[in-house]
């Protein structure tokens, strides 16, 4: 199983759960290299030669030779990939009047373009083992956009459409599904997106399950979809029911 952006947080939870379930895992990272190697070392101590690290910028998709190098590096540790999990993402506001070409390119590349072109590059290997593609999306990638995050919303919506388009195109050989987290990881309390205790309480109050989700909740769904041989083209909300009560709005709500 190859999980992009998997050195920390949700990605690392997916890797740990998959490894515990018996998968050999490839931990992809770029800036979080030390965390990636620490995670791999921990997993390999439990089961030798079962975890590998792939350090790469997803911008490799912009160059065909670099992309092929990424594919070969991904195949090198274990010789095959049967599950591709698109977890890497960039998330920050782009209010009207502040949108730049750089922000557009970065958010679109990470959240939409890279998943499509990586899927295409790895497709022959996934087809050979009747594998699957699983994308980590967002409950706001449908019809409940974040206010002030228009480029992110557009990119995740494109990614969601990719899931459903590829599910049709690649069936019956490769299954393609998505997972839409709600609030499963809170912003870093030291970041400019940090929320107050009152804001956190308001979020919990808006969730029918009355708790913030966890990365493990997402990991559990990834493992389910990896095994669910008759499910394709689905996007499962893992949000404690939040999307049922949400009509879009500001991050602070």
Please state what every model-predicted region is.
Residues 7-8:
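Conserved glycine-rich cofactor-binding loop
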Residues 23-38:
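Conserved glycine-rich Rossmann-like NAD(P)H-binding loop of the short-chain dehydrogenase/reductase
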Residues 39-40, 178-207, 246-253:
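A glycine/serine/threonine-rich, flexible loop-to-helix segment
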Residues 80, 160, 170-186, 231-238:
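Conserved Rossmann-fold SDR core element
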Residues 95-96, 103-105, 199, 203:
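Substrate-binding pocket helix/loop in short-chain dehydrogenase/reductase
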Residues 125, 211-238, 243:
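C-terminal substrate-recognition "lid" of short-chain dehydrogenase/reductases
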Residues 127, 132-158, 163-171, 183-184:
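Catalytic loop of short-chain dehydrogenase/reductase
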